[in-house]
Amino acid sequence: MVTVLAALVVGVGGTLAVERTLLSPNATDDVADICGGTAVSADVGPVTRNIPSNPPMTSSWVDYARDGSLLENCTVSVGRTQVLRVTANLERGSTADWERFTKSQIPGAAGPKMAFDAGDRAVSYEKDAAIHVPCTLPRNQPKNDDGKAITTYVAVVAHASGAAVEENDKRRQDLAYLASRVAEHAHSTMRCKEPLNIPDGAPKVGSVG
């Protein structure tokens, strides 16, 4: 049996975010509900391959978007150990700023850096994936002191602890897929003006970044 807990969480400035927690006695039960269903779509394999199949799990999904702010945070834990995390944030700056942001989120990234086809830029490591999605807001675009519009983008980062037994190449593919699904959801949520460059299925990982 799966227990679902939902709550309204007070965010910055008194705004509300939806937080949804899934408690399951088995890590493969109702896995389609993970991340509010956002990151799974019709394929649960990328999730189940990255979480142990025996211990109970807890999955939390926070989806907050208001007034040009975005926070999407999906975590899966087994016991007290976090085994999977996917986040999306609206950030300001250039691609170089995104690269610095990504390094701050995955400072210990292991394995060769590779590219995959998603967003404006996307990089893959053995246990991490990150996507840069250009995102000009439909209204209230932030401006600098000179009145010029500030470039904004959605930064998506996915991380798996490697607690589940999975080959590195397959884990790369799964994390690229999960990051892409959350990027797709974030792009729709923020109504970014730029066309969405996210493949329907799993992105191709392989070219060296």
Language-model-detected regions and their locations in the chain:
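Hydrophobic membrane-insertion alpha-helices, especially the h-region
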Residues: 1-20
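A small/polar (G/S/T-enriched), proline-flanked helix-loop surface module common
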Residues: 20-184, 188, 195-208
